Amino acid sequence: MHGSKPPSSARTPSRAISIRIARDPNDLMLVTAIRAAVYLAEQNCPLEEEFDGNDLVAAHFIGFVGSEPAACLRVRFFGEFAKVERLAVRHQFRRSRVSFKLVQASFDYIKRKGFKKIYGHAQDRLVNFWAHFGGKPLGHNRKITFSDFSYTEMVLEIEPGPDAITLDSDPYVIIRPEGDWDRPGVLDISSARPVTSPLRSAALVEP
């Protein structure tokens, strides 16, 4: 009817951007789908080069535009630095700010973990994107090429946040779900139960 509101399914979908850390196999499937669309389909990267064996030893971030998974990014941790890598944005979302918010969320996470340096490999054509966040060429003049692109080593000096997690942090904070340290987790809740396990006083049995 004229003048009636369109059904909800016909309304313009939300373009709000949200970021979350991957927590379960379903989230990792989203990461795989995004990277396959960008790197395998668009850049013709071989499967074994894109999915390099490091995905299960890393933290992954997923960026959403509305309810649609639009982008992802991977973070790995080393002794002195964290490495940001595998930033992928689906082509229809590249005019949004999801990539900027995704990178910033990962940097905030890295600061919370107490790191002082972020390292990455920027495709030469994307050096200016990383410079926007304060990244600078590492300066070692090492030429890096893989998966048919040339890369520049980038480094970003950061200050850990005032709430960075250390050995002095509340032990319950340390065991909360990764990246969600400000909310009580399931183990916080379990701490309200008395110590009743029948094994609580059992001595270890010598082999």
Regions found by a protein language model. Name each.
Residues I21, L28-T32, Q43-F93:
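A conserved beta-strand-loop-helix scaffold within acyl/acetyltransferase catalytic domains
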Residues G79-F81, K117, F149-Y151:
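A generic structural signal for beta-strand entry/edge sites
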Residues V84, I118-A122:
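Conserved hydrophobic beta-strand within the GNAT/NAT acetyltransferase core sheet
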